[in-house]
């Protein structure tokens, strides 16, 4: 057994929980271990009560190659558990406690655990979303409690970093969302299409959970301008918004033959197939913190089209890896037509290949050291 003091104790979703936060936590902590930084992850015995979880399951069947210990210890709704966890942290005595934050449901457990910590343990808030995408009662008050127990903060984008800076005088380090290290290998486009039983049309895809703020209705509307083009739309991900309204919209616009839907949470191999089969990945969000899909699209060297909003547009504009559209269906349809042109595809793919070397977990950890 390793008796060396834990450098980083990380509270976050991790296996067996599914999703991008869990996936990236594994890449992050594996990289910490590879840098000889002793790391342990404490995840949740209960994260979301079933009553408020909108999906089919919170759990993943995927197996991760992890180099660190994961313990399921934190219950988000049990105050007695919070005190117990705080005592366990003090006993372990890590140099840093990293609290990964993406939802107000974490504020109370993080606050009460932090309240009873040994003050020598430095607490870092690692922030995915600062403002919840859907309105939550008392969010500002809850977030202030969380802020009180953190010594400093790290964000995955300037957009989120600026939001945090508006709320606190504590140190905030704005970084970037790295490309995960455990992604399945790139697949040839023809093989990916064959795997998914797709025809030879151009394909553009929306990948991820379908929620109201993701702008999928706008994306569907853009295809009324593309009816006569050899382009099909893939919507792949679990619907957290009622699917019927999207199906009704598709039928009303006469787009049944143009839209392919997979209403399932996608494991990483399926995400790989859809992105590799696509000519473009589209993120038509109405608001965003940053995107976990952008680094995945970069890994698979697929150009992007994103909304003209903070949190999405900056990386695309900086790297010239796709197009930014002005938040109307008509403008999105024009961006799609422009971006599937051969010369544009070659340019964007070339720019992605040059840029993606910047977005590594290794570089993220080097930047993190300054905090």
Regions found by a protein language model. Name each.
Residues 37, 136, 165-166, 178-195, ...:
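Acidic anion/phosphate-binding donor-loop and adjacent secondary structure
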Residues 44-48, 207, 232-247, 263-264:
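Glycosyltransferase donor-sugar binding loop
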Residues 148-186:
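Donor nucleotide-sugar binding/catalytic pocket of nucleotide-sugar-dependent glycosyltransferases
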Residues 198-214, 220-223:
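Conserved donor-binding/catalytic core segment of Leloir-type glycosyltransferases
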Residues 246-269:
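Nucleotide-activated donor-binding/catalytic signature segment of Leloir-type glycosyltransferases, i.e.
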Residues 273-289, 302:
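Acidic donor-binding loop of glycosyltransferase active sites
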Residues 297, 303-306:
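Short hydrophobic beta-strand element within catalytic cores of glycosyltransferases
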Residues 318-330, 336-344:
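Conserved acidic donor-binding segment of nucleotide-sugar-dependent glycosyltransferases
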